[in-house]
């Protein structure tokens, strides 16, 4: 008895249009080949996208071309795909996969043509390619974006992208450029001067005063007669200066106070140093010098004591001799 494998229905593939395959007896008796149904059945169950299998799509294209001639994507056998919604137009592809894949469906409502551009760098861009990809311009721009270093609120690009950076950060209104240049250029704030300080020293550029007016005795600034203070680095009224001084009275007083404080502290240290050391007499110094140990010379104290004792003995002998002579004189008289 033959085994028909009724328990394995996975080997039988039926299309969606064949609701009742046993109702038509002609299909089992005749080997009639329907190109439209075969075309739809072949491609309804294939869900592989064409970009992944370009060689397979080319083989299917050649197979259908040999059977039916040039492939035609008319609407006569694709009317059952109207319910699909696509993002692309009918000019996106010429492969048979356009009938099965809703992304390449020819009857969908496509966006305006200005939002799309053809990508000719795909895998099928050669001589034997049978499809062209339609990629939105936003995606194309993402592929060609430049890589920059984002620090804070600004992105820094390489030197090769100077044109791109200039176009990115250029000002929208041309009038603002002249105003910005005039504000960024440092000029002297004295009335009637307005000297350009772009090439002056950093001190003059920072405080917006030229070298001449920074040393002048009288300068008209902000409608008042003033003088530039060397320590404050700003203009003051003439009443705040003493005679022809270039620094204001307040800053000079602070400067003098600091100088006096320095001198007082220095003199105080000198006084404390001299007060600790007491003056020494020459006898003390001689005694200390004599008391210092010396290996060669004998101590001087013993010699002096010896001399004093010898002087005392001689004095006592002389006094005894005189007393004896006196006694002899008085006795003889």
UniProtKB/Swiss-Prot annotation:
GO terms for molecular function: DNA binding; zinc ion binding. It is found in: Nucleus; Cytoplasm. GO terms for cellular component: cytoplasm; nucleus. Binds 2 Zn(2+) ions per subunit. A motif (Bipartite nuclear localization signal) lies at residues 245-261. Residues 264-284 have a biased composition (Polar residues). Residues 1-28, 254-303, 314-333 are annotated as: Disordered. Expressed in shoot apical region and early floral tissues. Transcripts levels increase in developing pollen sacs, and decrease in later stage of anther development. Strongly expressed in the placental region of the carpels. It comes from the Eukaryota. Residues 179-269 are annotated as: Sufficient and necessary for DNA binding. One of its GO terms (biological process) is microsporogenesis. Keywords: Cytoplasm, Developmental protein, Differentiation, DNA-binding, Flowering, Metal-binding, Nucleus, Transcription, Transcription regulation, Zinc, Zinc-finger. Its cofactor is Zn(2+). Residues 16-25 have a biased composition (Basic and acidic residues). The keyword Metal-binding applies. Residues 289-299 have a biased composition (Low complexity). Its main location: nucleus. Zn(2+) 2 binds at residues 229, 232, 236, 248. Zn(2+) 1 binds at residues 188, 193, 210, 213. Changing residue 233 to A: Slight decrease in DNA binding efficiency. A zinc finger (SBP-type) spans 185-262. Trans-acting factor that binds specifically to the consensus nucleotide sequence 5'-TNCGTACAA-3'. Binds specifically to the 5'-GTAC-3' core sequence. Involved in development and floral organogenesis. Required for ovule differentiation, pollen production, filament elongation, seed formation and siliques elongation. Also seems to play a role in the formation of trichomes on sepals. May positively modulate gibberellin (GA) signaling in flower. The SBP-type zinc finger is required for the binding to DNA. PANTHER family: SQUAMOSA PROMOTER-BINDING-LIKE PROTEIN 4, SQUAMOSA PROMOTER-BINDING-LIKE PROTEIN 8. This is Squamosa promoter-binding-like protein 8. It comes from Arabidopsis thaliana (Mouse-ear cress). The gene is SPL8.
């Amino acid at each position: 008895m033959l085994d028909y494998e009724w328990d394995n229905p996975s080997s039988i593939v039926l299309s969606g249009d064949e609701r009742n395959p046993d109702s038509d007896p002609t299909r089992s008796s005749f080997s009639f080949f329907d190109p439209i149904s075969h075309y739809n059945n072949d491609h309804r169950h294939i869900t592989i996208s064409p970009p992944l299998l370009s060689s397979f799509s080319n083989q299917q294209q050649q197979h259908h071309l040999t059977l039916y001639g040039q492939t035609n994507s008319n609407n006569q056998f694709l009317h059952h795909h109207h319910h699909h919604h696509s993002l692309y137009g009918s000019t996106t592809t010429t492969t048979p996969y356009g009938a099965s894949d809703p992304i390449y469906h020819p009857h969908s409502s496509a966006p305006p043509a200005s939002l799309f551009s053809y990508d000719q760098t795909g895998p099928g861009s050669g001589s034997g390619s049978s499809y062209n990809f339609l990629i939105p311009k936003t995606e194309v721009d993402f592929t060609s974006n430049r890589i920059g270093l984002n620090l804070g609120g600004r992105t820094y690009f390489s030197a090769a992208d100077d044109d791109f950076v200039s176009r990115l950060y250029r000002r929208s209104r041309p009038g603002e450029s002249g105003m910005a240049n005039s504000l960024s250029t440092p000029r002297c704030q004295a009335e009637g001067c307005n000297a350009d300080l772009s090439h002056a020293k950093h001190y003059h550029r920072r405080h917006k005063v030229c070298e001449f007016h920074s040393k002048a005795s009288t300068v008209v600034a902000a409608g008042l007669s003033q003088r530039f203070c060397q320590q404050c680095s700003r203009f003051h009224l003439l009443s705040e200066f003493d005679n022809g001084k270039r620094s204001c009275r307040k800053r000079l007083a602070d400067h003098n106070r600091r100088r006096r404080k320095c001198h007082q502290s220095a003199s105080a240290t000198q006084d404390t140093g001299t007060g600790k050391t007491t003056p020494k007499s020459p006898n003390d110094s001689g005694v200390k010098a004599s008391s210092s140990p010396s290996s060669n010379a004998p101590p001087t104290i013993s010699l002096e004591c010896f001399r004093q004792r010898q002087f005392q003995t001689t004095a006592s002998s002389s006094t005894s001799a005189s007393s004896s002579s006196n006694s002899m004189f008085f006795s003889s008289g």
